[in-house]
Amino acid sequence: RKSLEVVERITGVEIPFYEADIRDTDTLRDIFKQEEPTGVIHFAGLKAVGESTRIPLAYYDNNIAGTVSLLKAMEENNCKNIIFSSSATVYGDPHTVPILEDFPLSVTNPYGRTKLMLEEILTDIYKADSEWNVVLLRYFNPIGAHESSDLGENPNGIPNNLLPYVTQVAVGKL
């Protein structure tokens, strides 16, 4: 919620906020009816690779079932534009770098598997109904901050990713 407040302050625009479980299709339907969005940027999901190997069912339930719930609500409200936050983990452990978009897919963990499954689900939806506009983003861990430095990755505790860890050390927090 804090990040949303910073975005509102920076942009001067109030952003509607709903705290809900992405797997709750009825609540999502109500939100879509209320807000009438024309598109969705989908970042919701569990995202720790290591954790996904310990509790894979939680990842499948939240990431897969949650996204299917979201897609149902979108379709029922004629919202057929989605940008999906996938992951470079769908490439597994490539033999060379840099990784190119057309490299073979080789998932090595449940988190990456949920991302690949969802890419396939979204591709199937598009093939079945070309009114859908689907963008799949396969990026690595992004890092950066707004020029004001009011908005950027500021993890609680010890970060899971290298660059946020380095920045925390640099500013004396670790």
Task: Cite the ranges covered by each PLM segment.
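N-terminal Rossmann-like NAD(P)+-binding domain of SDR-like oxidoreductases, especially those catalyzing
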Residues: 1-145
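NAD(P)-dependent short-chain dehydrogenase/reductase
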Residues: 123-174
